[in-house]
């Protein structure tokens, strides 16, 4: 069996159950695509076939691209993993840590104990979180009139931290801010 036939067989098997409606696979080298094929349906509830030009919403794929771009900038000496991020993005100089809310629902904020670095941003240890999954940050966004991160508005990147940089890990808008650093440089 040829390599292409083996790949086709494996992918056809992958969609044969009810777990995956359909998929598109592409392999490329420096000269362009060397394999591409589509299998299954675009939607479990729909009979429309998957094609190699089907448009997907692939959440968080920009994180890998942003991480690679940031590390290329580090290799080139244009960014440093441990440089204070506010040296590149001045708006980060005003970033505070959200401690909670007072009895009138005003945010209680303080300055972070450590600097936000590119390393923190790339490892989700800067203190930024998603308002979707963090109740305190969701409340802050409502009280402060801050747009949700999912809107793609740059103002969403001005949210406060949920904890001090380097204190712990939490998934959030960190990579979006790292992406702004790459853009700025």
Language-model-derived ranges and their functions:
Residues 44-170:
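Active-site-proximal loop and beta-strand segments within enzyme catalytic domains
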Residues 12-49, 81-83, 137-140, 144-145:
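A short, well-structured edge-of-sheet supersecondary motif
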Residues 1-2, 166:
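Short, low-complexity N-terminal intrinsically disordered segments enriched in polar/charged residues
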Residues 66, 184-185:
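Conserved beta-strand->loop/alpha-helix structural units within folded catalytic cores of enzymes
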Residues 71-76, 176-184:
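Short glycine/serine- and small hydrophobic-enriched flexible loop segments
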Residues 173:
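Basic, Lys/Arg- and aromatic-enriched nucleic-acid-binding interface segment
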Residues 4-12:
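Short amphipathic alpha-helical segments
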